[in-house]
């Protein structure tokens, strides 16, 4: 098997991030310097983002049976790289006050990004599994990075044990599917499924187990119990990564699997997925209503958002629109989450023990940091799906797909869930404009808008507003990124 230059260029984002991992590792071994390592990380991720332009020039290619690089994988790779960049940027000021080793943080983020890029191009069950593991393993370390805090350590252990259990389900499911169909690439799975083998008990059992494993990674009900605890325990920059890159990469891979292998055509699988979507939307929104901790609230809301996305996934076989929906929704979700978690990270930096994550810390933020609270307001509006923000178009598309595919139950659930969601997002927004407490527990420095993290947060809010008012460029982009069939 010789690899041509074309294939090397197609793999360039993966190779560049891998090279950055090695460089950062050598830098840490040679001399610890927080600034140097952070800069190396950001430069590496930026070069990887720029290399996507050259990947686009090459056109769709298959690199070994495991990876397929096309517009679809480039889109998801770009989203993962943006999320990793934002995470590194938020982490720098947070780590400034951190008493232990700081540099390994960037190393772990880079390795997780590597897993995300691999998942975006996965075309085979083996690369799907390797990608998920590469993404999950560094996250155990990242979630427990503030290990002197009991909560962070607890979150890390919870996540590790549950993740291991979920991975074993996933692997066993893959083994059963392989036993039945004799091949592990997505396309040949599609062939064996289209020959009406889907009623074979082994295939159904394998699919069921894979749904358990993937449902855990996407924190869908009933595999969601870790989500709020881990989001709350993890440092704010890590919660950013978990909520964005961790979900988007896995969803991209699952999306491709469903496109090539018409899994949702089977009545039983579709019913199971519909129940999961319905439960996720309802549970996520209802549980978020009573939260007083902003990271837990965003954790529950991410369960609901993945429920909305699952509606589009169920309809993916029958409708071209579903691909577009997922693209638009994920971009909106990415920037809204980056902004919301970014504000939490800015408030929590530098490290001073627990994060500023109680809603009380944000009370009256408007009176001394008006722009920061405006950013937070925009993010909450976008997550709630209010018109003139990007989140609205995502919701609108999901409803359109649901109606087109005649998923009436789920469309009703999306509407109801959005209504409940409005209540708790408004709660966060209202608390920003109440009277400020006399003694400020946590606050950002006055020049926050000039720091790198502040710039990321401001750019996110501008993107959300710009595409909310004028979504055409984004829609055209998403229509271009169709997977190679």
From Swiss-Prot:
GO CC, alphabetical: plasma membrane
Reactions performed catalytically: a quinone + NADH + 5 H(+)(in) = a quinol + NAD(+) + 4 H(+)(out)
GO biological process: ATP synthesis coupled electron transport
Chief place where the protein resides: membrane
UniProt keyword annotation of Cell membrane present: yes
Keyword terms: Cell inner membrane, Cell membrane, Membrane, NAD, Quinone, Translocase, Transmembrane, Transmembrane helix, Transport, Ubiquinone
Topology within the bilayer: Multi-pass membrane protein
TM segment ranges: 8-28, 35-55, 75-95, 105-125, 127-147, 159-179, 203-223, 235-255, 271-291, 297-317, 326-346, 374-394, 407-426, 449-469
Gene Ontology molecular-function annotations: NADH dehydrogenase (ubiquinone) activity; NADH:ubiquinone reductase (non-electrogenic) activity; quinone binding
Cellular location(s): Cell inner membrane
Top class in the EC scheme: translocase
EC number in record: 7.1.1.-
Pfam hit, one: Proton_antipo_M
Disulfide cysteine pairs (residue numbers): none
Protein function: NDH-1 shuttles electrons from NADH, via FMN and iron-sulfur (Fe-S) centers, to quinones in the respiratory chain. The immediate electron acceptor for the enzyme in this species is believed to be ubiquinone. Couples the redox reaction to proton translocation (for every two electrons transferred, four hydrogen ions are translocated across the cytoplasmic membrane), and thus conserves the redox energy in a proton gradient.
Family (UniProt): Belongs to the complex I subunit 2 family.
Quaternary structure annotation from Swiss-Prot or TrEMBL: NDH-1 is composed of 13 different subunits. Subunits NuoA, H, J, K, L, M, N constitute the membrane sector of the complex.
Family annotation (PANTHER family): NADH DEHYDROGENASE
Protein name: NADH-quinone oxidoreductase subunit N
Species lineage: Bacteria, Pseudomonadati, Pseudomonadota, Gammaproteobacteria, Enterobacterales
């Amino acid at each position: 098997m010789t690899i041509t230059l074309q294939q090397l260029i197609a793999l360039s984002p993966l190779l560049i991030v891998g090279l950055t991992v090695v460089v950062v590792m050598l830098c840490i071994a040679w001399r610890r310097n927080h600034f140097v390592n952070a800069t190396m990380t950001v430069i590496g991720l930026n070069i990887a983002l720029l290399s996507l332009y050259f990947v686009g020039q090459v056109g769709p290619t298959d690199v070994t049976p495991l990876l397929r690089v096309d517009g679809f994988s480039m889109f998801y790779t770009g989203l993962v790289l943006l999320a990793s960049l934002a995470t590194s940027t938020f982490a720098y000021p947070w780590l400034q006050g951190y008493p232990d080793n700081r540099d390994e943080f960037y190393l772990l983020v880079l390795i997780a990004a590597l897993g995300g890029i691999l998942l975006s191009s996965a075309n085979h069950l083996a690369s799907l599994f390797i990608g998920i593991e590469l993404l999950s393993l560094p996250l155990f370390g990242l979630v427990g990075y503030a290990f002197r805090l009991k909560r962070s350590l607890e979150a890390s252990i919870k996540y590790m044990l549950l993740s291991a259990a979920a991975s074993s389900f996933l692997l066993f499911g893959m083994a059963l599917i392989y036993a039945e169909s004799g091949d592990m690439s997505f396309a040949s799975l599609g062939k064996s499924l289209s020959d009406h083998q889907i009623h074979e008990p082994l295939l159904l059992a394998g699919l069921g187990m894979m749904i358990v494993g993937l449902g855990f990674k996407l924190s869908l009900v009933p595999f969601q119990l870790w989500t709020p605890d881990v989001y709350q325990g993890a440092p704010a920059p890590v919660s950013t990564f978990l909520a964005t890159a961790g979900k988007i990469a896995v969803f991209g891979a699952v999306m491709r699997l469903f496109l090539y292998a018409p899994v949702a055509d089977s009545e039983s699988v579709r019913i199971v997925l519909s129940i999961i979507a319905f439960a996720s939307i309802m549970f996520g929104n209802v549980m978020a209503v009573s939260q007083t901790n902003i990271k837990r609230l965003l954790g529950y809301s991410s369960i609901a958002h993945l429920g909305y996305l699952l509606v589009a996934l169920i309809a993916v076989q029958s409708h071209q629109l579903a691909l577009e929906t997922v693209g638009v929704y994920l971009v909106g979700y990415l920037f809204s989450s980056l902004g919301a978690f970014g504000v939490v990270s800015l408030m929590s930096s530098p490290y001073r023990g627990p994060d500023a994550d109680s809603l009380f810390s944000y009370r009256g933020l408007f009176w001394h940091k008006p722009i920061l609270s405006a950013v937070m307001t925009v993010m909450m509006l976008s997550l709630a799906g209010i018109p003139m923000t990007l989140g609205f178009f995502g919701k609108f598309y999901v409803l359109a797909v649901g109606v087109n595919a005649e998923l009436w139950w789920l469309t009703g659930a999306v509407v109801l869930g959005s209504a409940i969601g409005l209540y708790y997002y408004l709660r966060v927004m209202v608390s920003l404009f109440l009277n400020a407490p006399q003694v400020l527990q946590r606050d950002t420095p006055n020049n926050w808008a000039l720091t790198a993290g502040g710039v990321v947060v401001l750019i996110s809010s501008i993107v959300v507003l710009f595409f909310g008012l004028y979504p055409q460029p984004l829609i055209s982009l998403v229509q271009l990124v169709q997977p190679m069939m």
